[in-house]
């Protein structure tokens, strides 16, 4: 019984260069490059224009790592070819953001401003003062930076003020019932 996800082949798009050296996997594409150490018990090989990830045995932990490794490798190949992005909206009177060097300075109703500097490989864009776009080749890093920005002022359920993902729907609550 193999991992359902792990046994799917990964197609290598045109313009992406893949190298496998033992347990080290590296992908290079138009948007950048990324590398990953494949876990013990799992091997990857290139056959034609596909990457095949296989488990060395049928033990439960190996099957779990098999699916994980295949998903991460597929995310890397997509990331170096297309890149990943997450869009956040800033909702609330007086809440805004402005570029400061490579980082962004947020005014979120606190007594001070908050500056967020992106890690290596992540870029922050500001199409307007109420929208932030996080871009990069690493899916996990893009999601983590977006989550850290959202955490600065999470949306509250009464008026919906705060930083939310663009596709997120905030569950609203009714206020106190008047007499």
Curated annotation (Swiss-Prot):
GO annotation (BP), single: cytoplasmic translation
Taxonomy, superkingdom: Bacteria
Listed InterPro entries: Ribosomal_uL6-like, Ribosomal_uL6-like_a/b-dom_sf, Ribosomal_uL6_a/b-dom, Ribosomal_uL6_bac-type, Ribosomal_uL6_CS
GO terms for cellular component: cytosolic large ribosomal subunit
UniProt record similarity statement: Belongs to the universal ribosomal protein uL6 family.
Role: This protein binds to the 23S rRNA, and is important in its secondary structure. It is located near the subunit interface in the base of the L7/L12 stalk, and near the tRNA binding site of the peptidyltransferase center.
HAMAP family attached to this UniProt entry: Ribosomal_uL6_B
Subunit structure: Part of the 50S ribosomal subunit.
Listed PANTHER family: 60S/50S RIBOSOMAL PROTEIN L6/L9, LARGE RIBOSOMAL SUBUNIT PROTEIN UL6M
Protein name per its UniProtKB record: Large ribosomal subunit protein uL6
Gene designation per UniProt: rplF
């Amino acid at each position: 019984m193999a991992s359902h996800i792990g046994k799917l082949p990964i197609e290598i798009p045109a313009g992406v260069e893949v190298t496998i050296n033992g347990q080290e996997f590296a992908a290079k594409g138009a948007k950048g490059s990324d590398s990953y150490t494949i876990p013990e018990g799992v091997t990857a090989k290139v056959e034609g224009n596909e990457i095949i990830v296989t488990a060395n045995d049928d033990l439960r932990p190996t099957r779990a790592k098999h699916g994980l490794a295949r998903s991460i490798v597929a995310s890397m190949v997509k990331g170096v070819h297309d890149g990943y992005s997450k869009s956040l909206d800033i909702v609330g009177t007086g809440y805004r953001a402005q570029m400061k060097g490579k980082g962004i300075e947020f005014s979120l109703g606190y007594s001070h401003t908050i500056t967020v500097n992106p890690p290596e490989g992540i870029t922050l864009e500001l199409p307007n003062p109420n929208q932030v776009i996080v871009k990069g080749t690493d899916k996990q890093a893009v999601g983590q930076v977006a989550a850290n920005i959202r955490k600065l002022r999470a949306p509250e359920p009464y008026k919906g003020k705060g930083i939310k993902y663009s596709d997120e729907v905030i569950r609203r609550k009714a206020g106190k019932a008047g007499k």
